[in-house]
Design a protein with these regions (language model features):
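C-terminal helical cap(s) of enzyme catalytic domains, especially alpha/beta-barrels
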Residues: 241, 245-255
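Core catalytic lobe of class I
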Residues: 1-243, 273-276
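Conserved SAM/SAH-binding loop
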Residues: 16-22, 260-267
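Short, flexible loop/turn segments with low-complexity composition
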Residues: 157-161, 255-265
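Terminal low-complexity, poorly structured segments
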Residues: 3-5, 239, 253, 260-263
Length: 276
């Protein structure tokens, strides 16, 4: 039985469910997924154990990546924001491992974007101080792995809202912008709206459907509203659903929702829509 949306606002919907169990999304209906799954670094989410054994984490990742693949159209894409690696609880090559699993369940690899978040958490660690005994290496970057289901090239025409300067800068492969403040957003691991905004404008047409299976504070749906995409967010934690709903409502009011949900409502005068 399909659950009712926690929030439905125009073409944006939030579901308070476990993504692995939800039946709210039709197979082969998603054009683009933009998400940052749990990192398994013991972040206190409230309703999810973010410190499980690594093999269990990889199996969990396999399940959700497979389901996401099933929900995606043949020319659909996935932008997967994950850490390059992790050191807490033992060094693990998260980016490499999840990329391998994604390919094993059917995703095809396209590219990797390096996100230089400029050390938002101000992390510092040295391990063995001034000694070769056991020094730590910290990567102050994350990655966005770009994958696709069957066809990288879109099989239909649509309207792109990306500007020329954005296209040139964003296809460079190294993105430099700051991370988001936990305190300001009220979520233990938010990403800035700049991240989904770039993915959405670069990899989807206006009016297409974007999914975030780990919605968190709702940032992906905010970008959907601002850029004229339909958006579906799934979040297991009810308190985070409330937070996401509040942020989405505020964004809807600020961007005049009745215009944004139209196919060209979010385009500025400076942007020239074009078919690709």
């Amino acid at each position: 039985m399909r659950a009712k949306p926690f929030l439905e606002l125009g073409k944006v919907r939030i579901y308070n469910e476990d993504f692995l169990e939800t039946e709210a999304i039709e197979p082969d209906s998603i054009d683009l997924t933009v998400t940052s799954p749990p990192y398994n670094v013991d972040i206190k989410y409230g309703s999810y154990d973010d410190g499980i054994p690594y093999d269990e984490y990889l199996e969990f990742s396999r399940k959700w990546l497979r389901k996401c693949h099933d929900l995606t159209k043949d020319d659909g894409r996935l932008c997967l924001n994950v850490p390059l690696d992790k050191n807490k609880g033992g060094a693990q090559s998260v980016f490499a491992d999840l990329t391998i699993i994604a390919k094993e369940v059917g995703w095809k690899y396209y590219a990797t974007v390096i996100w230089n978040e400029q050390n938002i958490s101000r992390r510092t660690a040295w391990g063995s101080w001034m000694s070769a005994s056991a020094p730590y290496v910290i990567a102050p970057v994350e990655v966005i792995v770009v994958l696709y289901k069957k066809s990288w090239e879109k099989t239909h025409e649509g309207i792109s809202d990306i500007a020329e300067d954005e296209l040139i800068e964003w296809t460079d492969g190294v993105w430099n912008f700051s991370g988001e403040s936990k305190r300001r957003i009220g979520h233990p691991s938010p990403f800035p709206v700049e991240l989904p905004k770039r993915c959405i404008k670069l990899f989807s047409y206006v009016g297409e459907t974007v999914l975030d299976p780990f919605l968190g504070s709702g940032t992906t749906l905010i970008a959907c509203l601002e850029r004229g995409r339909a958006g579906i967010g799934v979040e297991i934690n009810r308190e985070y659903c409330k937070l996401a709903a509040k942020r989405v409502r505020n964004t809807g009011a600020q961007t005049k929702l009745e215009e944004v949900i139209g196919p060209l409502g979010s385009l500025t005068r400076e942007e020239t829509p074009r078919k690709r």
